[in-house]
């Protein structure tokens, strides 16, 4: 496993906490159903959960970040951010008849959301909430959901399996000026509250399937898949059960393919399809990604462990450059016990991130990717050759005079200028040089012809 040291931008930390704060309520000690990864099916391609949001929020409050947002000087910012978060929630949850504020009224335990691919070309979303201790509030919420959907001119259909409320949303008419717009897709909302669980989704069949296995879970669940097991093993390493976590998981190529089918683009959309290109270039070797976020974890204010699960192709040496095909061979990140900042990095910078990357292999693997993006074979070689041979160009051998002189350490440094303004941010990208004199000469030669 590759180890990276990352300083996280405070803005993202605030996003996590203020989102969870919207869920603040009283939490039950006992779960109403098995952990959601044992409830959602093995066709789940994306998943987010917080098993104990109350403990998660409290752990944040104990950090310096928590103290920062409680500072009176931050009051206006926090208020504005909450309003923006609420507005964003309305845009995303509105079609399900929900708001961010609703999610603060009913949870008594875990909150989880999953993207499921029931069959090729379809993508279903299901929200699962443990409502233990909040059954009455949940019943009221169901009535509020119906009122909101009716206001959106949704049509209530016959209950699915006599217990799941189903609403058909009105289709958005394409603009008369946009003849290339994709055909509008039928959208429905399915809602059910049974026992101590609230299940909301855009596919009544998938909502029914989740409801049916809430007592004992299912054998063919997300947690049973090889990808999820490997991601979880790495993401949870050295994180004890005492740490309340936000966890996430995604099968990036399966999710992208399903999303693309479920949300067709304009008929004449121009430009390359980068997801298809990456798949053709071998990057579909990345089977899954996931992680866990904890606050107040020992010496760390915030700890985020992210895992990319990309096993070598069958029969390939895991340590070989050729463990993947084509451009995906550039996915080589050497092991490192730790990565320390360069000596010249100031102590007062606002952020610092660093990793190790085999730049030489990446360069040698880039040809097919560049050609695929451009749509013409030989483009990459032509550009490299022209930089070396064109009498009006810099006449540099990119691989020998530059790439071969670079090390494997890459660093991103964030800082700001005062007084603080909208354009105060500064960013430096630094790459280790093992032959700095030759690198300087090559860069100087290239700039001289610019």
Residue ranges and their predicted role:
Residues 1-11:
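N-terminal secretory signal peptides that target proteins for export/translocation
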Residues 11-25:
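Bacterial N-terminal signal peptides
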Residues 28-184, 226-288, 295, 307-423, ...:
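Structural boundary/hinge residues at secondary-structure and domain interfaces
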Residues 41, 133, 192-198, 301, ...:
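Short, solvent-exposed coil/turn segments at beta-strand boundaries
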Residues 131-135, 202-207, 433-436:
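Helix N-cap motif at beta-to-alpha junctions
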Residues 145-151, 207, 211-225:
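A short alpha->loop->secondary-structure connector
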Residues 187-201, 205-210:
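Hydrophobic or amphipathic alpha-helical targeting/insertion segments
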Residues 425, 429-442:
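C-terminal substrate/ligand-recognition segments
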């Amino acid at each position: 496993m590759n180890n990276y040291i990352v300083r996280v931008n405070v803005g993202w930390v605030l996003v996590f906490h203020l989102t969870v704060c919207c869920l603040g309520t009283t939490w039950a000690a006992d779960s109403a159903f098995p952990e959601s990864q044992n409830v959602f099916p093995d066709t789940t391609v994306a998943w987010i959960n917080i098993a104990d949001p109350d403990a998660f929020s409290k752990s944040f409050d104990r950090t310096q970040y928590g103290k920062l947002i409680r500072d009176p000087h931050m009051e206006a910012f926090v208020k504005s951010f909450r309003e923006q978060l609420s507005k964003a929630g309305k845009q995303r949850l509105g079609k399900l008849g929900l708001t961010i504020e609703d999610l603060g009224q009913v949870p008594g335990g875990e909150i989880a959301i999953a993207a499921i691919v029931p069959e090729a070309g379809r993508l279903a979303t299901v929200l699962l909430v443990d409502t233990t201790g909040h059954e009455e509030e949940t019943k009221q919420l169901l009535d509020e959901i119906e009122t909101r959907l009716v206001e959106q001119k949704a049509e209530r259909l016959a209950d699915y399996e006599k217990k799941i409320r189903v609403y058909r949303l009105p289709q958005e008419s394409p603009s008369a000026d946009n003849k290339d717009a994709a055909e509008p897709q039928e959208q429905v909302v399915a809602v059910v509250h049974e026992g101590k669980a609230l299940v909301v989704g855009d596919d009544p069949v998938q909502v029914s399937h989740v409801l049916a296995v809430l007592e004992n879970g299912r054998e063919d669940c997300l947690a049973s898949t090889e990808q999820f097991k490997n991601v979880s093993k790495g993401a949870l390493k050295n994180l004890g059960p005492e740490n309340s976590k936000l966890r996430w998981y995604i099968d990036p190529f399966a999710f992208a393919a399903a999303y693309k089918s479920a949300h067709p683009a304009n008929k004449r959309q121009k430009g390359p399809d980068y997801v298809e290109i990456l798949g053709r270039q071998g990057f579909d070797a990345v089977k899954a990604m996931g992680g866990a976020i904890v606050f107040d974890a020992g010496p760390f204010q915030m700890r985020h462990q992210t895992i990319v699960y990309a096993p070598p192709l069958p029969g390939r040496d895991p340590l070989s450059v050729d463990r993947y095909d084509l451009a995906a061979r550039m996915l080589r990140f050497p092991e490192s016990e730790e990565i320390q900042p360069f000596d010249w990095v100031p102590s007062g910078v606002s952020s610092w991130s660093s990793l190790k990357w085999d730049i030489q292999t990446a360069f040698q693997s880039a040809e097919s990717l560049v050609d695929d993006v451009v749509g013409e074979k030989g483009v990459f070689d032509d550009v490299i050759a022209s930089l070396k041979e064109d009498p009006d160009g810099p006449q540099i051998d990119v691989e020998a005079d530059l790439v071969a002189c670079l090390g494997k350490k890459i660093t991103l440094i964030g800082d700001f200028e005062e007084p603080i303004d909208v354009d105060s941010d500064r960013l430096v990208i630094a790459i280790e040089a093992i032959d700095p004199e030759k690198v300087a000469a090559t860069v100087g030669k290239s700039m001289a012809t610019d």
